[in-house]
Amino acid sequence: MLPRLLRRRAHRRETPAPARRRTRPAALAVLGAATLVLVGACADAGTGDQPQAAQNPPDLAQFYDQQLQWGPCADYAPTADDAQTYADPQFDCTRVTVPQDYARPGDGKTMQIALLRKKATGAKIGSLFADPGGPGASGTSFVARQASTWATNGLGDRFDLVGFDPRGTGASQPRIQCLTDAENDEERTKVFADPSPAGVAAAEADSRQFAERCTQRTGADVLANVGTRDVAKDMDVMRAAVGDQKMTYAGFSYGTELGTAYAEAFPQNVRALLLDGAIDPTQSTIDSTVKQNAGFQLAFDNFAKDCTSRPGCPLGTDPATATQAFQTVMRPLIDTPAQVSDGRVLSFSDAQTGVSQALYVSQLWPALQQGISQVANGNGDLLMRLADLYHERDDQGRYSNMLQAFQSISCVNQPALKEPSEALELATRADEAAPFRSTGRGPVGARDACAFWPVPPTSEPHTPKVDGLPPVVVVSVTGDPATPYQAGVDLAQQLNGSLIAVNGNQHTASLQGDACTDTLAIDYLVNLTLPPQGAECTLAPS
């Protein structure tokens, strides 16, 4: 039987896996104990229970003033695996109508944003909206799975817990759709490791085909309006539709990007923003990708130190040679995939995906050690299971649209790398930053699907302008592979916010059972009490 951790899902943003044609998210955030180290005195920002009324845009009155009809959630489950959870009567669901294009709110084209709610059990402050990241992850699924934890830590007493599926994702309508299940399976077998002109051309042809399929099956008009800035506007409509005067929000990983965008667009409507696993809005695609690859190499190196100290480590006994030993095991998969017991084969791409999934939390290091050992013996079962979780593929071979939404949203969130020289620079620097991911055949300077996207981006790297924003809190983990620690430091400065530094090896830390981080985060969300300057938590070792 697989370890319990391997049967859980969460969603976070990640950069391209090597030898793939498109960027991919990955995640498996888990819980850990923590200890608290505090420096300085608490600053109280007040309770904020009686905020001033928000001023809603008059041209959007039909959306801001809509009356929601809540009902059972069974039909909102984004995957078959979620069906039982969504059937729980403690949850109710609805869809909020928003304009497809906020520049043309009266043209009759709308989208339906799915919401899942667990009502507050005590003296209610308002709603706590939450997003787990991606982009492309289901916020309704996230809140449904976190509700039992949040119900016992004080949040469920004071807030309606509300998850939402950002436009194009999960149970929201219309959904982004690019690939069939069979096409998804086929894509995962492909490896683009040939740096020659012919190899680059093949990779780019695959990227172009993906962009064409997304356009044909979703529509360019939808793809043009799924960016972060659009979702931030949806969030304000949601706030008003549930009856809240101010926004209380917890965003994780890419969810911090949503929170930042909301802060820029509606600073006057913010009550509290908790942003954990920060995306730095000033970074370019190349810089953020390279830094994230460096973060994963650090996570691999930390894993290797642990593995080489244990008996039976497939990487040997010397952490200094662990990357080379890992490459020796993995690189043969480029030409000869490993067998999987269900009849599929584990490609080099899927193997790297499974490894990245396991690097998100140190609790998965024993499983990763076992998975690498299996591959060394021609067995791809465990790493394939990890890759399936990453791709949200169930046992019947059905996929959610998370990864397709990830690509589609990413392509409108930042300018594409349209020049071959830019693609080669990215591939070269990413290889250098994360040698454990390298094919050993040289960087493949192929442009990804965004270079062939049918619509232009709606955002670009910038320094956020947040005049009038109330105090916010940013959480950043020192050993976070997907959203490196420094990005949290930088975002806290950009938003004039408070930082909670967490020492540990995992992606995000708050509201997941970590006593130290949770104490600070919950006190902020409930009482608006800011953490002391220099607040620091240390996760207990796994």
Residue ranges and their predicted role:
Residues 177-191, 263-325, 370-395:
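A catalytic-pocket lid/entrance helix-loop region that shapes and gates access to the active site
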Residues 61-62, 323-469, 513, 519:
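Alpha/beta-hydrolase fold active-site neighborhood
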Residues 244-254:
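Alpha/beta-hydrolase fold nucleophile elbow
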Residues 468, 473-476:
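Short beta-strand/loop motif that positions the catalytic acidic residue
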Residues 2-9, 13, 19-30, 42-192, ...:
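Catalytic-loop region of hydrolases
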Residues 37-41:
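C-terminal motif of bacterial Sec signal peptides marking the signal peptidase cleavage site
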Residues 481-486:
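Conserved alpha/beta-hydrolase "acid-adjacent" motif
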Residues 217, 232-246:
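Conserved acidic catalytic loop of the alpha/beta-hydrolase fold
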